[in-house]
Every structure is written in structure tokens, then in C-alpha cells.
Amino acid sequence: MKTTKATESFTAEEREAMKERAREAKAASSKADGLNDLLAKIAEMPEPDRSMAERVHAIVVAAAPDLAPRTWYGMPAYAKDGKTICFFQAASKFKVRYSTFGFQPDAMVDDGSMWPVAYALTELAAADEARIAELVKKAVS
């Protein structure tokens, strides 16, 4: 039976995301450093990801100013008590056709016995922005 190395199971993008997460865990930076890291990652994104990430950032900060901005697997994220609540993943990160706005298990987005924890974004209309703000407020309630 042929064996493969574990690294062959992951794409180059996935391996880079894991390396970024390891660097983030080592840094365990303050809220100010987290914001600077997040803004730097957004600035590195190609368009249209950058514009979308900037808008999502503004929405999250306005909806839940107590969340701590940071990076998570090299992407913008927002934490409460050190635990990631929500995140933005640029389409360019894994070379897919849509960006993702998602929630982690500590987000209070429960809705009955089944609910979405991630949303595909191809653009942001006013209704989408309002929905993201509503979801973020619910997530931290």
C-alpha cells in the first residue's frame, strides 16, 4: 500500500493558512495589534476582495464594537473573550468564486435545530449589509 505525506493532503493555500494561524497563536497580540494586523491583511487583498473586506469590517465594528479585531488563519476575524466569533474569508484565499462571512461555535446565531454558520458573498448590497449587522448583533447577544 502506498503511503503519502500528510502535507500532500493539503493545498498550498491550506498549508499557508495553517502557518499563518500558528504565527497568530504565537503572537497572541493585543486588541490594537490585532486591528493593525487585520487592516494590513485587508490591504494585501486584491480587488474586489479588499473593498468587500473593508465594508464587512466597518459593519462588524459598528454592530459589535466590543469585539476584538484580529486575524484568524490569515483572514479578518473578530473575537470575544479570546474566542473567534465571526470571520471574513476572501475569495482569493482559496481561489474560489465567492468570499465567505462565517461564524464560529461561540457565536449565538442559533435558530431552532438548524441554522447557517457561513454565507457566500459575491457582492454586498444594502440588504446584505443590514443582514450581516443583524447577524453580528445576534452573535454577541
What are these model-predicted stretches?
Residues 1-141:
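Charge-dense, helix-prone N-terminal extensions
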